[in-house]
Amino acid sequence: MSQRHSDSSLDEKLLEYRFHAELRLDANGNPIPGLPMVRSSLKARANAAFEPDASEPLPPPPSPEDEEPPRPIVLSTQSPAALKMGTQQLIPKSLAVASKAKTKSPARHQSFGAAVLSKEAARRNPQLFSAPSFSLDDMDMDMVTTGNLRRNLRNQSYRAAMKGPGPPSSKGDSVQLGPKLQALAEEAAQPPSRYPAKNKKTLGRKRAHKGSFKDDPQLYQEIRERGLNTSHESDDDILDEPSGPVGTQRADTTIVVKSYRPAQLTWSQLPEVLESGVLDTLSTEERKRQEAIFEILTSEFSYLHSLSILVTEFLQSRELRATMTQTEHHHLFSNILDVMSASQKFFEALEQRHKAQVCVEDISDILEDHAQHHFHPYIAYCSNEVYQQRTLQKLSNSNAAFRDVLKEIEKRPACGGLPMISFLILPMQRVTRLPLLTDTLCLKTQGHPERYKAASQALKAISKLVKQCNEGAHKMERTEQIYTLNMQLDFGKVKSLPLISASRWLLKRGELFLLEESSIFRKIASRPTCYLFLFNDVLVVTKKKSEESYLVQDYAQLDHVQVRKLEPSEPLLPGGSSRSSSVPYPFQVNLLHNSEGRQEQILLSSDSASDRARWITALTYKERQWQGITNKGELPQVEVTKAYFAKQADEITLQQADIVLVLQEEDGWLHGERLRDGETGWFPESFAHSITSRVAVEGNVRRMERLRVETDV
C-alpha cells in the first residue's frame, strides 16, 4: 500500500515538472523573461489556487521519501492572482482550440503534456474511466451541448491542466506560449459532417466535387426520400434539416425503416448556398420548396448510381451470362439499358438547372417533359416484370451454376451486400415514388399560382405514366395466365365455358378440403379435396388430376355465389353434429345458379384461419366493389418495413415505405389498400409496422384523396 502511494506521489511530481516546462516558468513560478505584456508573476498550485512570489531557488526533483508538507488552501476569490489586473492571460496550449469541425482522424496532433494530463485527471477521478476516450485538441469550445458528460469532462480537463507547476524539463520540450491565442485554421482534409449545425459554415472542402452531393454516392436502396412522408403538410416539415443521427426521425411521425439513410445533403447545406447568403433572406416556405426540388435531384443521382451497379456488376458479367440462355438473360434484364439512359438524361437536365441557379426557379417543366416523352422505357420494363420474376425463380431453383456465380457477385463491395433482386426492382420503385415526390413539390408551391399549376400538370403526367406501367404489368401477367389455364382446364361432361377474355383475370386459386357426410369424422389426410379457380367474374370448381391438368366439376358466375363462415357451434350438415376438431376452419359456398342452372351447396374447409379469411374475402369481391369504404380515416394504417413480393394472386407486392390502409386482419396476415394507387391484397403482418401518430394517419388520408382527385387514379 505504501509502495503504491509512493509511486503515485512520484507520478505527481513528474507531472508537475513537465507542466512547468510547458508554461515556461522560472524557479519562482514567474514567466521566463521575454514574454511580452506580462504584468506580474503567476505560480499555479496543486489546488488551483495561487500564492505570492517566492525567491527561493528551484529545488531538485523530490524523491518519494522526501514529501512536502501540505500547503494551506487559498480560495480562488482571495488569491493574489484573482486580485491582480492584466490585459493578457496565460492558459495551457491544450485548451487553446478554436472552433472547427470535429474529426475522428488520428492524424491530429496531441501534445505529450495534454495526454498525460488527461490520464492524470482520469486517475484522480476513477469515474472518468467509464467515459469514452477523448482528446483535448478535438474539443469544440464554441459547441453548445446539453449533455452532462461532455461538460463535466471539460471542467475536469481544465482543473487537471491547471494542476500546478513542477520542475522544468529540457529546453527542447518547452513550448513557447504567446500572450495572444491564435485560431487554428480548418483542415482541408477533414470530411464534412453529414449534418452540420445550421449556423456553422463548412466551406473550403477540397473534395472531388467541392462539397457536392456527388461526393458520397449512396445506393438508392439505402436512402429514404423525405418527400415520401405524408405528415409534412404543416409548418413542421420533414424537409427541415434532420436533428438526429442518420436513420432516426422525430417521434410521432410516420414510422421509418431503420436501415434507411436520408440523403446526405440538404439544399441549405450546400457550400454554394451558404456562400451566397441567400438563406438570410429566403422565406421558410421557399426554402422548403428548394429542399423538395433538390431531393428529386439527389435521389435521382442515387437511383442512377444503383442502376450503374446493376449494369456493370450483373448485366455485363460474362460469368453470369454463361450460366443462362440468351432468352433467359433478356427476360432477366429486359431493357434496363434504355431505362438507365432515360434516367441519365433526366438527371442531366435537373443538374443543369441546379448549376445555373442557386435558387432553382422550377423543375416542373422538366418533370412533365420527361414523363411524356422520355420515360416510355419504364412501361416496357414494368410489363416484363412477370417474366423477370419467373426467370429469376427458375434459375435460382434449378441452376446451381447460376446460384454460385450470383452469390459471388453479390458479395462484391460495389453491391453493398444487397441481392440482385433489389437492383432489378429499382425501376418499379422509382417510377412509383416520383408521383409522391412531385406531390410534395405541389404542396410547397401552393402560394404561387403559376408554379402550382405547372407542378400539378407534372404530377398528372407522371401519374399517367405510373398508371400505364401498372396496366402493362397486369395485362401481360393476366393474358399469359388466362391462356395457360385455358389449356389446363378440362371441362369434360360439364358445359364448356369460354375462358379467354380481355376483361377477365384470376383473383385466387388453391386446394381446399371438401366436406361430405361420410367424411365428417375422418382424419384430414383422408378427406377428399377440390381445387378452386376464382376469377373476377366466375368461380370454377375442379378436381386436380396433375400439376398441369384440372377436371372441371362445376362453375357459376360470381354474382350468383354466396359464402358464409361457419361458427364452431353450427352443424356442418343438416341434422349433423357440431363442428369437430378434425374440421378446424369450415365455410359454406352456395352456387345459386350453377352450370346447369341449379342451386348447389358446397362445404369446404381450409387448414388455417388466415386461409379461410382470404377465401371469404376473395369470394365477396363483387360485394366489396359495390360497397366501397365509407370512412378511410378511421382505418388503421401500417408502413412497410421491407419489400414483399406477392406469391399468390390475392396477395399484393409492396415496397419499403409503402403506406397501406388495413381493411382486415387475420392470423398474422393483413388485407389492405395501398395508398399510392388503391390496389388491394394480402401480405404478412411481419412486413409492416403500425402507424400510431394520429397526425400522420390523417395526413396520409388527405394525401390519398388529393392524389386520387388530381391524378384520377
From Swiss-Prot:
GO MF entries: guanyl-nucleotide exchange factor activity; PDZ domain binding; receptor tyrosine kinase binding; small GTPase binding
Sorted UniProt keywords: Cytoplasm, Guanine-nucleotide releasing factor, Phosphoprotein, SH3 domain
GO CC annotation: cytoplasm
GO BP: activation of GTPase activity; cell chemotaxis; positive regulation of protein localization to plasma membrane
Region named Disordered: 44-77, 185-249
Domain DH: 288-472
Family matches, as CDD domains: PH_ephexin (cd01221), RhoGEF (cd00160), SH3_ARHGEF16_26 (cd11938)
Biased composition (Basic residues): 197-211
Annotated segments matching region Required for RHOG activation and mediates interaction with EPHA2: 279-485
Keyword Transcription on entry: no
Domain PH: 505-624
Biased composition (Basic and acidic residues): 212-227
Chain ranges for the short sequence motif PDZ-binding motif as given in the UniProt record: 711-713
Phosphothreonine modified-residue sites: T230
Quaternary structure, from the entry: Interacts with ELMO2, EPHA2, RAC1 and RHOG; mediates activation of RAC1 by EPHA2. Interacts with TAX1BP3 (via PDZ domain).
PANTHER family: GUANINE NUCLEOTIDE EXCHANGE FACTOR (PTHR12845), RHO GUANINE NUCLEOTIDE EXCHANGE FACTOR 16 (PTHR12845:SF3)
Function: Guanyl-nucleotide exchange factor of the RHOG GTPase stimulating the exchange of RHOG-associated GDP for GTP. May play a role in chemotactic cell migration by mediating the activation of RAC1 by EPHA2. May also activate CDC42.
Name by which UniProt lists this protein: Rho guanine nucleotide exchange factor 16
